[in-house]
A protein has these predicted regions:
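Extended hydrophobic packing segments that form well-structured cores
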Residues: 224-257
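A short glycine/serine-rich beta->alpha loop
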Residues: 27, 69, 144
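Catalytic, metal-anchored helix/loop core of enzyme active sites in primary metabolism
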Residues: 2-5, 57, 122, 245-257
Length: 257
């Protein structure tokens, strides 16, 4: 993991901002569950949102290109789901909402169930869920809702910047003490951070490799001769999404060093 402000690389241009999560879904990996990813994103220098000290979590809502103008993070859940359904030319009960399986989401879950939408509870790793919600050729998740990590919001925004869609976020204090500390530091807790606020650059790249097999990517598979990995790479300039199946041979790797 990189700390905020850490410098990496060989010191030569081009200069870029880097966001990385070596394991998005640490609990998933520890328990051998599906969906753990290694994730990295880059953008022009100074264009990625850097969370202020003390900001750990954000409220989030993420959708695909057809619904990008339909969402408002300040609106009630029922209103957002109605707008999303209309934009998708579907019914609310056709929608699938991804939510992290956490006690803090009990009220959101209740509201989603009240209007009849389906729920997919995810154990960890909301970056993959945000990407799946934004992908036009994936219909397993229509919207990501709930509270997750602030660094993961930037990574998700980088991917969404490449493929279209929209993510909106707001800083979420975990308790009153944290809320008062953030206010004292001059942080506006009502501010909405959209995709272009989280990643302002127009030259964005995103890549993820599966660690444990999930719906987005296969996990690492080990063999006597080496390993096979499954990755996705995206670029904002072209909107290109590439899936890469790579074979890594132990003998060749040691010779290359």
């Amino acid at each position: 993991m990189l700390y905020i402000g850490e410098h990496v690389g060989n010191g030569h241009k081009p200069e870029v901002d880097v966001a990385v999560d070596p394991v998005d879904g640490t609990r998933l990996l520890a328990l051998g569950l599906p969906g753990a990813l290694a994730v990295v994103a880059t953008a022009e220098r100074g264009t990625m949102y850097s969370a202020p000290p003390g900001v750990f979590y954000m409220e989030k809502i993420a959708v695909g290109p057809a619904m990008r103008n339909a969402i408002d993070i300040n609106a009630p859940v029922a209103v957002n789901l109605d707008r999303i359904a209309r934009a998708r030319e579907a019914r609310i009960d056709d929608l699938t909402v991804a939510i992290l399986d956490r006690p803090r989401h009990a009220e959101i879950i209740r509201q989603v169930r009240e209007v009849g939408a389906r729920i997919r509870l995810i154990g960890d790793g909301d970056v993959a869920a945000a990407i799946q919600a934004a992908m036009e050729d994936y219909r397993g998740i229509d919207v990501l809702l709930g509270i997750g990590g602030a660094p993961e919001a930037v990574l998700a925004a980088a991917a969404i910047k490449c493929i279209g869609g929209e993510i909106q976020c707001k800083i979420w204090p975990r308790n009153d003490q944290e809320r008062e500390k953030l206010k004292a530091d001059g942080i506006d807790l009502s501010q909405i951070y959209r995709t272009d606020d989280l990643v302002k650059g127009n030259d964005v790249a995103f890549a993820a490799t599966g660690i444990t097999t999930g719906e987005l990517l296969d996990g690492v598979q080990y063999f006597g001769w080496g390993a096979r990995t499954s990755s996705v790479m995206m670029r904002s300039r072209s909107g290109t999404v590439r899936y890469i199946q790579a074979r890594h041979k132990w003998r060749k790797s040691s010779q290359a060093q």
